[in-house]
Swiss-Prot record:
Protein name (Swiss-Prot/TrEMBL): tRNA-specific 2-thiouridylase MnmA 2
Gene Ontology terms for molecular function: ATP binding; tRNA binding; tRNA-uridine 2-sulfurtransferase activity
Binding locations of ATP: 10-17, 36, 130
Originating gene: mnmA2
Residue pairs linked by disulfide bridges in the UniProt entry: 106-204
Residues at the active site: 106 (nucleophile), 204 (cysteine persulfide intermediate)
C-alpha cells in the first residue's frame, strides 16, 4: 500500500480520542472516525452507564464530535471477534488462576489488528488512537520505537508493548507530546460536548467492574469452592472459587488470623488458594513468556532495564536475560510486591519500550 495522508482514528466518545481527531485534521490529514462496537456484558448492573466507553451514549458522543469536526464517522461491529479473542481469553485466564490484562491483548489484536484492517479497507494508510505515547523511527536500527508519553501520569506505553513493527509503521499517536490538562483545555476551547466527560476507569466490557459476576455468567458450573491453605500446607478454611482471588489480595478472604493474611499463590490443579503474611507476597525473580520486543528484534544477551509488573506500578531496575525456549528471566534489584501470573511485565530503556511479556510465574 502506498503511503497517503488518510488516517482512521479510533473514537471512543471520550475526550482524548476526540481531541486527537481534531489535532490530526489540523495537521492536514484526511481523517475518518471509527468507533468499535465490542461485546459488552448486557447483564452487568452498569451496562448503560455513561462512563462506559462501550455504551450507546459513547457511540453517539463520538458521532457528534465527528460531525462538529466535519469528518466522516463509521461504527464497526467487532463484537463477535472481540468476544472470541478478548472475553474468552479473560475468562480462561481467571479459570487458570491468573490475572489477565485484556487491554494489552485488545490493543494488538483488535485496535491495531481488526480496526487497522478496516482502516485499510477505507483507503487509509494510518490508524490513530488517543493513547498518551510517542512513536519514532530509529535510522540506525531501522526499527520503529514506542516511547512514553511526556505526561508521566498518563503514559500508556505499558498497554501497547505488544505492537509489532508493521502495526507501529501504520500507527499515529497525536497526544504523545501533550499533557492531559492541555487536552481537556483544548476540548473546552473547541466546545466539544465531551470536554467535561469523566475518564472511564473500568474494563470496557465489564461496566460494573464485577469480574467474578461476568465469569460466572460465562462458565456457570466450572467455579467450585476449595480450600485455603497456608504456605506450609496447613488447612485454614474454604474459599468461594479461585476466580475471586488474585496475588497480594487481602480483602474478602473471610479468614481470621492474628496477623493479616494475603493470597500468595493459586494452585489450580488442587483448587487451593495459598495464603501467607506480608513478607510472603514479595519476590525478586520471575519468568515471562509470550514476549514481544520493539526496540530490539530479539533478546540475545543479558540487558539492564527498568521494568514494571502492572500498569499502575513504578518502574524498578532489573536485569533481563534469555531463558529456556523464548522465555525471559527477569531479576529485579529490589523485591517487588505481588508478582502476578497473567499480568504483563514491560521493559524500558529510559523512555523507550524495549518489550515485555506475560508473567508466567514467580521464581523467588
Amino acid at each position: 500500500m502506498e503511503i497517503n495522508n488518510r488516517v482512521a482514528i479510533g473514537m471512543s466518545g471520550g475526550v482524548d480520542s476526540s481531541v486527537a481527531a481534531y489535532l490530526l485534521k489540523k495537521q492536514g490529514f484526511d481523517v475518518i472516525g471509527l468507533t468499535m462496537r465490542v461485546w459488552v456484558d448486557h447483564e452487568a448492573k452498569a451496562f448503560d452507564s455513561d462512563k462506559s466507553c462501550c455504551s450507546l451514549k459513547a457511540t453517539q458522543d463520538a458521532k457528534k464530535v465527528a460531525e462538529i469536526l466535519g469528518i466522516p464517522h463509521y461504527t464497526v461491529d467487532l463484537s463477535k471477534i472481540f468476544y472470541d479473542k478478548i472475553v474468552n481469553y479473560f475468562v480462561n485466564e481467571y479459570l487458570k488462576g491468573r490475572t489477565p490484562n485484556p487491554c494489552v491483548l485488545c490493543n494488538r489484536q483488535i485496535k491495531f489488528g481488526e480496526l487497522l484492517e478496516k482502516a485499510f479497507e477505507l483507503g487509509a494508510y494510518y490508524i490513530a488512537t488517543g493513547h498518551y505515547v510517542r512513536k519514532e523511527y530509529d535510522e540506525k536500527t531501522k526499527r520503529y520505537l514506542l516511547k512514553k508519553g511526556i505526561d508521566s501520569s498518563k503514559d500508556q506505553s505499558y498497554v501497547l508493548y505488544r505492537l509489532t513493527q508493521k502495526q507501529l509503521e501504520h500507527a499515529l499517536f497525536p497526544l504523545g507530546n501533550y499533557k492531559k490538562e492541555e487536552i481537556r483545555a483544548l476540548a473546552e476551547e473547541l466546545k466539544l460536548p465531551v470536554a467535561k466527560k469523566p475518564e472511564s476507569q473500568e474494563i470496557c466490557f465489564i461496566p460494573d467492574n464485577d469480574y467474578s459476576g461476568l465469569i460466572k455468567r460465562q462458565v456457570k458450573d466450572e467455579i467450585k469452592p476449595g480450600e485455603f491453605r497456608d504456605v506450609h500446607g496447613k488447612f485454614l478454611g474454604y474459599h468461594k472459587g479461585i476466580i475471586h482471588y488474585t496475588i497480594g489480595q487481602r480483602r474478602g478472604l473471610g479468614l481470621s488470623s492474628d496477623r493479616p493474611l494475603y493470597v500468595v499463590d493459586i494452585d489450580v490443579k488442587n483448587n487451593v488458594v495459598v495464603v501467607g503474611h506480608q513478607e510472603d507476597v514479595w519476590g525478586e525473580e520471575l519468568i515471562s513468556s509470550n514476549n514481544n520486543f520493539i526496540s530490539i528484534e530479539k533478546l540475545e544477551k543479558e540487558m539492564k532495564v527498568t521494568a514494571k509488573i502492572r500498569y499502575t506500578a513504578k518502574e524498578e531496575e532489573a536485569i533481563i536475560k534469555p531463558y529456556e525456549e523464548d522465555k525471559v528471566l527477569v531479576k529485579f534489584l529490589k523485591p517487588q510486591r505481588a508478582i502476578t501470573p497473567g499480568q504483563s511485565v514491560v521493559f524500558y530503556d529510559k523512555d523507550v519500550v524495549v518489550g515485555g511479556g506475560i508473567i508466567e510465574r514467580k521464581l523467588k
